[in-house]
């Protein structure tokens, strides 16, 4: 029998109970109904009066196609998930201020309704900042140019636009009857995203902004709880949640809120020039079991299906087009085994113990030097236990409840009845399946070269250098910087070619002088800035310098997005002249947004007939290539092998596949043990090889015959190496 509580302890409990009651009342008031269909207490979310252990997975609707959605959702359900989590992508839905788009891959309502049809719930992360390795963190670029705007702080113009979008999404979900109290699948919403770490560098406006965001969100009366991830000071009734590789250390900021893990990272993203990360499923399962055994009640796998950064949606900069993330369902929609199957078995074990887990707190017993037992006992006598071995190298035999159990290193066994071990996180029974790429189509090419000497009617001239994004508004990756330099008789007397130096904020740059290419330079994920230094041949009189600056995705992490820059910011100098060095930064420059081929729409069937195409262009830079092909037989996923090419973009039947880049991964790829703390540089592959070789082409984009493939090659490559392949396991 437990000792009677002291008066102080009893008073403390009364305060905690009263606080919980006040939060429950606040939540019910925000719901706008007498009894909230979805509420929470300190153990878990409560749905229609029932506490739940909820297993969730992230599937981002724009990173796959509507035709893929039903299959992905069903595979998530078959894998034992209860919830599908997705961000809402502001820049996809409001590409132009006040003009909204909710069709095709951005048909959010259709996606949510498909989840409902499958019998699953939805966690809708409205944000609208998403990070997500998504272009500009999900913010529309036009927001950067709203007068007086300052991002993610206590700023009137920013808050007005953010509130307008959040209310737009909430209103749309309500009008479609998609919140749980309306009979829909949405049980939870999120405002902002990982803002807590920004508060320390965000200045005096950071905390007021976070509080405003929470109050604004609750005021929309969604009828479901709101969360803020990585926001330790999230105000009531908002729940603060954890993101990370591990979250067993986490506790919510109030003892009447449940412990929730909104991003359990199943792997990591790939950047151009980086290795390909892999997270062993034994460690992932171990991390999830650790969280549950310590009272966690909501786990979301980020990502459960990563998908593809189609078009120019990848952020970073330098985030790859593949967003596979080593997820249980791979980029192409196929099961990644053994990860998918092992997690399914974990979920079954957790669900067997769910009634006990949500009704009792664990007691902790030491059963060895590195071993512990977390035991849950319900009032009705039901019992569940988690037996844990934290040693990274040694398997052990332990005794619990009079029985002996084998515990591999770095593992947890789950006993739903405190007797039978039905699952161990390090014991993988599912076979490993290695996917194969099967080349099935080669191409007959035609080519068209960009004219680097011509300027369109939209070009304009201005004194000095300008920031690229302020000109392009991200309508194109490309901006031409063109100027003229007069070389006098005495400037070239030494016989040595002048040295051109160009400083750029990123991300890639090509230099042409008098129409001749003088090479390219580019930055990387860790340092997007770059410098061009090269000897260029010039003649007496007027010389034309053309610099093509290329963006490779806009930053997705930070707070003051209004301060991000890209493009040639200077200085630009010409040296090794007899007259010394010329600073070209402040003279007249002519600017042109985009390439001629983009303006003509060469990536479309109609636009491709606007120019005269010739034979294959080989290794020429800034060249468009096109080919027609028939779709491979069957239904296997399809991918393009671009490993023989340089850098550029791809379209199939006018659909923008994305950026491609044969950028080799730097750094080392050592051995990989599942045991021990995981981080993003552990268990990498492809070091010294291409970060990405294969590019997903959704089947729904193909027709039986006469498909048009268009390639924009910036540097030059070997067209003979390009092929279309099917992916099988």
Swiss-Prot record:
GO terms for biological process: galactose catabolic process; plant-type cell wall modification. PANTHER family: BETA-GALACTOSIDASE RELATED. InterPro entries: BetaGal_gal-bd (IPR048913), Galactose-bd-like_sf (IPR008979), GHD (IPR041392), Gly_Hdrlase_35_cat (IPR031330), Glyco_hydro_35_CS (IPR019801), Glycoside_Hdrlase_35 (IPR001944), Glycoside_hydrolase_SF (IPR017853). This is Beta-galactosidase 4. Keywords: Apoplast, Glycosidase, Hydrolase, Secreted, Signal. SUPFAM superfamilies: (Trans)glycosidases, Galactose-binding domain-like. Belongs to the glycosyl hydrolase 35 family. Residues 1-35 form the signal peptide. GO terms for cellular component: apoplast; plant-type cell wall; vacuole. The active site is at residues 194, 263. It catalyses: Hydrolysis of terminal non-reducing beta-D-galactose residues in beta-D-galactosides.
């Amino acid at each position: 029998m437990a000792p009677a509580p002291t008066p102080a302890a009893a008073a403390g409990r009364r305060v905690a109970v009263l606080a919980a009651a006040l939060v429950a009342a606040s939540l019910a008031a925000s719901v706008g109904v007498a009894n909230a269909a979805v509420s929470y207490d300190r153990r878990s979310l409560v749905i229609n009066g029932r506490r739940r252990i909820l297993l969730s997975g992230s599937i981002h609707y724009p990173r796959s196609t509507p035709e893929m959605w039903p299959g992905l959702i069903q595979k998530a359900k078959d894998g034992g998930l209860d919830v599908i989590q997705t961000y809402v992508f502001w820049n996809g839905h409001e590409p132009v201020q006040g003009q909204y788009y909710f069709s095709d891959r951005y048909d959010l309502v259709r996606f949510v309704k498909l989840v409902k049809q499958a019998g699953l719930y939805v966690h809708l992360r409205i944000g609208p900042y998403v990070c997500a390795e998504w272009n500009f963190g999900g913010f529309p670029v036009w927001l950067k140019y709203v007068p007086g705007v300052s991002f993610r702080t206590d700023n009137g113009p920013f808050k007005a636009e953010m509130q307008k979008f959040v209310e737009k999404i909430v209103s749309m979900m309500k009008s479609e009857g998609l919140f749980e109290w309306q009979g829909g699948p949405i049980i939870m919403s999120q405002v902002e995203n990982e803002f807590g770490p920004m508060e320390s560098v965000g200045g005096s406006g950071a905390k007021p902004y976070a509080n405003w965001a929470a109050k604004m969100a609750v005021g929309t009366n969604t009828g479901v709880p709101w969360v803020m991830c990585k926001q330790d000071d999230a105000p009531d009734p908002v729940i603060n949640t954890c993101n990370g590789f591990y979250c067993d250390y986490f506790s919510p900021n109030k003892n009447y809120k449940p412990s929730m893990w909104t991003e359990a990272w199943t792997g990591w993203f790939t950047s151009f020039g980086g290795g390909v990360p892999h997270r062993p499923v034994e460690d992932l399962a171990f991390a999830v079991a650790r969280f549950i055994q310590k009272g966690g009640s909501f786990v979301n796998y980020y990502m459960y299906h990563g998908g593809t950064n189609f078009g120019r949606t990848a952020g970073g900069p330098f985030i790859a087009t593949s967003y596979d993330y080593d997820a249980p369902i791979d980029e192409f929609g196929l099961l990644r085994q053994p990860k998918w199957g092992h997690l399914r078995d974990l979920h079954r074990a957790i669900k067997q113990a769910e009634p006990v887990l949500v009704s009792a707190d664990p007691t902790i017993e030491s059963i060895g030097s590195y071993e512990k037992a977390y035991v849950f006992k319900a009032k009705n006598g039901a019992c569940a236990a988690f037996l844990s071995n934290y040693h990274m190298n040694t398997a052990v035999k332990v005794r619990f409840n009079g029985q002996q159990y084998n515990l591999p290193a770095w593992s947890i066994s789950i006993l739903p009845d405190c007797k039978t071990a039905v699952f161990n996180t390090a014991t993988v029974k599912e076979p490993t399946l290695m996917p194969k790429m099967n080349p099935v189509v080669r191409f007959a090419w035609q080519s068209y070269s960009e004219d680097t000497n011509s300027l369109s009617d939209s070009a304009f001239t201005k004194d000095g250098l300008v920031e690229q994004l302020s000109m392009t508004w991200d309508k194109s990756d490309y901006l031409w910087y063109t100027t003229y330099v007069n070389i006098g008789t005495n400037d070239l007397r030494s016989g040595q070619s002048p040295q051109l130096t160009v400083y750029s904020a990123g991300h890639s740059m090509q230099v042409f002088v008098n129409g001749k290419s003088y090479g390219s330079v580019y930055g990387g994920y860790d340092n997007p800035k770059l410098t061009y230094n090269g000897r260029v041949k010039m003649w007496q009189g007027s010389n034309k310098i053309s610099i093509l600056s290329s963006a490779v995705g806009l930053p997705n992490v930070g707070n003051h997005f209004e301060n991000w820059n890209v493009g040639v910011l200077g200085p630009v100098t010409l040296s090794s002249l007899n007259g010394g060095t010329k600073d070209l930064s402040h003279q007249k420059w002519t600017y042109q947004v985009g390439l001629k081929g983009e303006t003509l729409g060469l990536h479309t069937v109609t636009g491709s007939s606007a120019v005269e195409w010739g034979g294959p262009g080989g290794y020429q830079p800034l060249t468009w290539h096109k080919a027609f092909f028939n779709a491979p037989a069957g239904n296997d996923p399809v991918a393009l092998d671009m490993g023989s090419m340089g850098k550029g973009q791809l379209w199939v039947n006018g659909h923008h596949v994305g950026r491609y880049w044969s950028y080799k991964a730097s750094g080392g790829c050592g051995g990989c043990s599942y045991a021990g703390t995981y981080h993003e540089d552990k268990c990498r592959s492809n070091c010294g090889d291409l970060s990405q070789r294969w590019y997903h082409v959704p089947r729904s984009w193909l027709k039986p015959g006469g498909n048009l493939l268009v390639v924009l090659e910036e540097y030059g490559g070997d067209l003979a190496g390009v092929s279309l392949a099917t992916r099988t396991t």
